Amino acid sequence: QSTYSKLANFYAFNISQPGIPIIYYGEEIGLMGEGDPGNRRMMRFEINQDERNLKDTFSKLNGLRKKYVSLSLGDQTIIETKGPIFATLKSYFDEHTLLIINQSNKQITTKITLPINGELLVAVDNNHKINIIDNSVILEIEPMSHQFYYVSQ
């Protein structure tokens, strides 16, 4: 399970970076290479539940990149890189999207200070709202997971 979570976290990071995210066939299900580093195994089309979940995550992340222009075109501000937490803010005009990744096997509560003004942080997957107080929020991040939020002005 942790391997699939690591791949999902990597791809969440990947879609938040400038340029076009690249995935090779099979990466969306965690397919490993074979032989020389550039070679791939034959593609499998019957996949298990973990592989299906990873593929669904890749699809959702691609949808987020389409929906939130800041992810592809925005300026990036690295907010946090302490320990297992990585947080970055992508800003494109008035659209601000926060990505936070927990790379540990434990749930982490962390305080994030945003370099912009806003009233609410809203989770893009479930619309959970968190008040921003003095440009800061306290977030609980599940183990080996990532979360995208948008900043509501």
Language model features with spans:
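Extracellular ligand-binding/catalytic regions of CAZymes and related secreted enzymes
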Residues: 56-67, 86, 112, 124, ...
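Solvent-exposed beta-hairpin/edge-strand motifs
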Residues: 113-127
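C-terminal beta-strand-rich structural cap/linker in extracellular carbohydrate-active enzymes
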Residues: 133-153
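Hydrophobic, well-ordered secondary-structure elements that form the walls
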Residues: 14, 26, 61, 100-102, ...
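Carbohydrate-binding surface patches
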Residues: 79-115
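Aromatic- and carboxylate-lined catalytic core of secreted/periplasmic carbohydrate-active enzymes
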Residues: 44-79
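Alpha-amylase-like alpha-glycosidases and glucanotransferases acting on alpha-linked glucans and related
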Residues: 1-18, 81-83
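Aromatic/acidic polysaccharide-binding cleft in carbohydrate-active enzymes
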Residues: 11-51
